[in-house]
Amino acid sequence: MRSIYDQEMRDIQRDSIHMCNLASETLQDVMDAVRRRDFTVVERVLEQDQRIRSMRMALNERVMRMIATQHPVAVDVRRLFYIIHLADEMERIGYQAAAIGRCILRTQYGKVLLLEDIYRMSERTATMFERMLASSLNESTDAVRNVLTMDDEVDVLYEQIYRECITRQSGLRSQDSDVMTAVNVAQYIEHVGDHIVNWARWWLYFVGEQDSDIIV
C-alpha cells in the first residue's frame, strides 16, 4: 500500500509540473502571436487554455480523492493543498493568455500599439514564472523576493503603458480600438504577474515560511 501511495504522490507532482510547463508554453505562444500577428498560433493558445482547465479539474479530483482515501501524513497534506492552489493559478494564467489571444483576433490586422513596451512586460513575467518553477523544483525560496520585486516592475510598466494610451485616446473623438487593445493586453499580462505572486505566496506556505510581509 505504501508503494501505491508514494507512486500516486509522485504522479500528482509530475502532473502539476506538466501543467506549469503547459501554462508557460501558452504564455510564450500568445506573446509570439502578438509580435508576429499569427492568428493560427492564437487558435492553438485557445486550445491549450482548455487543456489547462481540464488538467486542473482532473488534478483537483485526484488530490481530493487521495486525501479522502489515503490519509496522507501532515507534510503531504500541506503539499497537496499547495498543488491545488498551484493548479488554480495555472488555470488563471491560461485564462489570461487566452484573453490576450482573443484581443488579437478582434484587432484588425493584429495591430498592437506600444508593442515593445508590452513585450518587455511579458518578458518580465516569463522570467518570474521560470524562477518560481525552478524554486519549486529545487524546493528553495531563494527566488521568491526577486519574483516580488519583478512584479513591482511589471506594475510600473503597466502604469506607463496605461498613461500613454490615455494620452493617445484623449485627442480622439471616438474610442480607438488599437488603444484599447494595448491597454487590455497589458492588463492581462499584469494579471499574470499577480497570479505568479500568488504562486510564490502559496509556495512559502508549503515550505513553512512565516515572513508576514510576503504572506498576506
Predicted segment positions?
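Cytosolic, long alpha-helical scaffolding segments
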Residues: 1-216
